[in-house]
């Protein structure tokens, strides 16, 4: 059974049906899914996006806001989401620590890898916010980077679909689920698992990536116990 895992949630997933902001019902659901992992003896880290609040690329689309500033705005959005997830985890009795790549001492700790590992060893959930701390990098890349740094055995990308498909299953009825694919296939066949930087970094560090449906209760724990029928895996 996998011991240490990093779970990546998109910011959009927190928004629920409204499409923006934070749905506390989804926060509660995420917290309960993470608690199941912790209760099973696993060490859990989280990275969350910020798309429910603002996306850097979109903010900079018309040229008024520079891309670098737009990306920093997106990083701040991930901190907001990180605080929300921390509150939800603590509400159900878990210990959680927020570490930000952008210093915000009043809100969370600075990102320090040794401290993050120590938190995990003590059974605390660590939420990594602020992306990588640099513009032009996605939160998917941040998730792969942090997972590599904490020496996670698995990176789970929790999405709205149950895996990776050869084309968009929401648009094409004949879309085929790909249960297993290599890093090279993900890169060369333009299959949208994560961006190329994320995939390349995962390949370099031999970090398996699992893509699954975050809205199915019990999915995360079942996958961590070895049920790969619920997901797609890139390795």
Curated annotation (Swiss-Prot):
<dbReference type="GO" id="GO:0033862">
    <property type="term" value="F:UMP kinase activity"/>
</dbReference>
<feature type="binding site">
    <location>
        <position position="71"/>
    </location>
    <ligand>
        <name>UMP</name>
    </ligand>
</feature>
<keyword id="KW-0067">ATP-binding</keyword>
<dbReference type="GO" id="GO:0005829">
    <property type="term" value="C:cytosol"/>
</dbReference>
<keyword id="KW-0808">Transferase</keyword>
<feature type="binding site">
    <location>
        <position position="165"/>
    </location>
    <ligand>
        <name>ATP</name>
    </ligand>
</feature>
<comment type="similarity">
    <text>Belongs to the UMP kinase family.</text>
</comment>
<feature type="binding site">
    <location>
        <position position="51"/>
    </location>
    <ligand>
        <name>ATP</name>
    </ligand>
</feature>
<keyword id="KW-0418">Kinase</keyword>
<dbReference type="GO" id="GO:0006225">
    <property type="term" value="P:UDP biosynthetic process"/>
</dbReference>
<dbReference type="GO" id="GO:0005524">
    <property type="term" value="F:ATP binding"/>
</dbReference>
<protein>
    <recommendedName>
        <fullName>Uridylate kinase</fullName>
        <ecNumber>2.7.4.22</ecNumber>
    </recommendedName>
</protein>
<dbReference type="InterPro" id="IPR001048">
    <property type="entry name" value="Asp/Glu/Uridylate_kinase"/>
</dbReference>
<comment type="subunit">
    <text>Homohexamer.</text>
</comment>
<feature type="binding site">
    <location>
        <position position="55"/>
    </location>
    <ligand>
        <name>ATP</name>
    </ligand>
</feature>
<comment type="pathway">
    <text>Pyrimidine metabolism; CTP biosynthesis via de novo pathway; UDP from UMP (UMPK route): step 1/1.</text>
</comment>
<feature type="binding site">
    <location>
        <begin position="132"/>
        <end position="139"/>
    </location>
    <ligand>
        <name>UMP</name>
    </ligand>
</feature>
<feature type="binding site">
    <location>
        <position position="159"/>
    </location>
    <ligand>
        <name>ATP</name>
    </ligand>
</feature>
<dbReference type="InterPro" id="IPR036393">
    <property type="entry name" value="AceGlu_kinase-like_sf"/>
</dbReference>
<keyword id="KW-0963">Cytoplasm</keyword>
<feature type="binding site">
    <location>
        <begin position="8"/>
        <end position="11"/>
    </location>
    <ligand>
        <name>ATP</name>
    </ligand>
</feature>
<dbReference type="InterPro" id="IPR015963">
    <property type="entry name" value="Uridylate_kinase_bac"/>
</dbReference>
<keyword id="KW-0021">Allosteric enzyme</keyword>
<feature type="region of interest" description="Involved in allosteric activation by GTP">
    <location>
        <begin position="16"/>
        <end position="21"/>
    </location>
</feature>
<dbReference type="Pfam" id="PF00696">
    <property type="entry name" value="AA_kinase"/>
</dbReference>
<dbReference type="GO" id="GO:0044210">
    <property type="term" value="P:'de novo' CTP biosynthetic process"/>
</dbReference>
<dbReference type="InterPro" id="IPR011817">
    <property type="entry name" value="Uridylate_kinase"/>
</dbReference>
<feature type="binding site">
    <location>
        <position position="168"/>
    </location>
    <ligand>
        <name>ATP</name>
    </ligand>
</feature>
<keyword id="KW-0547">Nucleotide-binding</keyword>
<keyword id="KW-0665">Pyrimidine biosynthesis</keyword>
<feature type="binding site">
    <location>
        <position position="50"/>
    </location>
    <ligand>
        <name>UMP</name>
    </ligand>
</feature>
<comment type="function">
    <text>Catalyzes the reversible phosphorylation of UMP to UDP.</text>
</comment>
């Amino acid at each position: 059974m996998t011991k240490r895992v990093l779970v990546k949630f998109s910011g959009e997933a927190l928004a629920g049906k409204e499409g923006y902001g934070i749905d506390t019902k989804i926060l509660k659901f995420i917290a309960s899914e993470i608690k199941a992992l912790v209760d099973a003896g696993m060490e859990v880290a989280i990275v969350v996006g910020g798309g429910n609040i603002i996306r850097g690329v979109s903010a900079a689309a018309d040229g008024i806001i520079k891309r670098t500033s737009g990306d920093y705005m997106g990083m701040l959005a991930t901190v907001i989401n990180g605080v929300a997830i921390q509150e939800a985890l603590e509400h159900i009795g878990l210990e959680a620590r927020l570490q930000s790549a952008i210093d915000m001492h009043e809100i969370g700790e600075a990102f320090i890898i040794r401290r993050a590992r120590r938190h995990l060893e003590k059974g605390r959930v660590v939420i990594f916010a602020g992306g990588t701390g640099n513009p032009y990098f996605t939160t998917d890349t941040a998730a792969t980077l942090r997972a590599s740094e904490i020496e996670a055995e698995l990176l789970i990308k929790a999405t709205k679909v149950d895996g990776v498909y050869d084309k968009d299953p929401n648009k094409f009825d004949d879309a085929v689920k790909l249960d297993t694919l290599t890093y090279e296939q993900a890169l060369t066949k333009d299959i949208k698992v994560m961006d190329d930087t994320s995939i390349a970094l995962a390949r370099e560090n031999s970090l398996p990536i699992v893509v699954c449906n975050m809205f199915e209760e019990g999915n995360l724990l079942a996958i961590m116990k070895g049920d790969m029928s619920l997901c797609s895996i890139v390795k």
